[in-house]
């Protein structure tokens, strides 16, 4: 009987120990599950951060691409503006050369007109002198008549030359007037071109500033991309570490569940044995 009591006490003690171990294993299992859930939450948060980092990286790359496209467009606009400035400078040079040629033709015509006027005045003076003189010498009269004829011829020639010069002068004046109109138009165009040149210069300065800012933004984007890439690598490393931790915790959970099953089986076996013992005692 004492042996049975001792056996029952031992079995009860073993049962209590088994229950304690089962409770401990259940608590450990709960803690392991909690750690696994926490780790899974960290993994989800890490994956979310990774997705956010990837989105930020894509956005930064798109902004960098847009900045490069805008910079290329500004460089093309700058080249077009430089071509327009060069063409305008060539047109100004041609207008200045045309004006110089017109001024030279005007000076030549003015000189020829002065010479013709001087010859006409001289002929008129000689004619008046010959008319006012009364010569008795026939030979001198003939000579004077010849001189008069020659003077008249010279006068007529001078008149003809004068008319020709006047006609040429009129043509030159017309050319000069057109040249002046072109010059005025050219001056207006020069003013417009200077204004356009000033605007182009301002645009060039703006483009230079924009290019400098674009370069600064490009460097900033590169730094951001580098930082984001480092963050992405760190996030991937944390995710990989978390995944390994989850696998390790899962193995620990599986092991604890196996131990819990074994302890439950032991507890059931002890309970069955106690029930059988109680039945045997009741039979006595």
Curated annotation (Swiss-Prot):
Gene3D superfamilies the record matches: 1.20.5.170, 1.20.5.340
One example GO MF annotation: protein homodimerization activity
Pfam families named in the record: Tropomyosin
Coiled-coil positions: 1-273
Tissues where the protein occurs: Muscle (at protein level). Expressed in leg and chest protection muscle (at protein level). Expressed in claw muscle.
SUPFAM superfamilies noted in UniProt: Tropomyosin
GO biological process entries: regulation of muscle contraction
Biased composition (Basic and acidic residues): 12-45
Keywords for this protein: Allergen, Coiled coil, Muscle protein, Repeat
InterPro entries: Tropomyosin
Region (Disordered), start-end ranges: 1-54
Comment field on protein domains: The molecule is in a coiled coil structure that is formed by 2 polypeptide chains. The sequence exhibits a prominent seven-residues periodicity.
Subunit annotation: Homodimer.
Function: Tropomyosin, in association with the troponin complex, plays a central role in the calcium dependent regulation of muscle contraction.
Family: Belongs to the tropomyosin family.
Protein name: Tropomyosin
């Amino acid at each position: 009987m004492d042996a049975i009591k001792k056996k029952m006490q031992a079995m009860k003690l073993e049962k209590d120990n088994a229950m304690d171990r089962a409770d401990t294993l259940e608590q450990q299992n709960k803690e392991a599950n909690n750690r696994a859930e926490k780790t899974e939450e960290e993994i989800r948060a890490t994956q979310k951060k990774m997705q956010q980092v990837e989105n930020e990286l894509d956005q930064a790359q798109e902004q960098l691409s847009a900045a490069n496209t805008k910079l290329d467009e500004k460089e093309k606009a700058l080249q077009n503006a430089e071509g327009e400035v060069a063409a305008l400078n060539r047109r100004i040079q041609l207008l200045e050369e045309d004006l110089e040629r017109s001024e030279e033709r005007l000076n030549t015509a003015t000189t020829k007109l002065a010479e013709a006027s001087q010859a006409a005045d001289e002929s008129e003076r000689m004619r008046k002198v010959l008319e006012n003189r009364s010569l008795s010498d026939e030979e001198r009269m003939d000579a004077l008549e010849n001189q008069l004829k020659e003077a008249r011829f010279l006068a007529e020639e001078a008149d003809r030359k004068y008319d020709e010069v006047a006609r040429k002068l009129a043509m030159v004046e017309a050319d000069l007037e057109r040249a002046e109109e072109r010059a005025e138009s050219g001056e207006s165009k020069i003013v417009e071109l200077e204004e356009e040149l000033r605007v182009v210069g301002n645009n060039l300065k703006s483009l230079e500033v924009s290019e400098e800012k674009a370069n600064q933004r490009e460097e900033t984007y590169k730094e951001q991309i580098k930082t984001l890439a480092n963050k992405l690598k760190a996030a991937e490393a944390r995710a990989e570490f978390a995944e390994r931790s989850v696998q390790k915790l899962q193995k620990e959970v599986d092991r604890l569940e196996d131990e819990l099953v074994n302890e439950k089986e032991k507890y059931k076996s002890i309970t069955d044995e106690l029930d059988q013992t109680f039945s045997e005692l009741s039979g006595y």
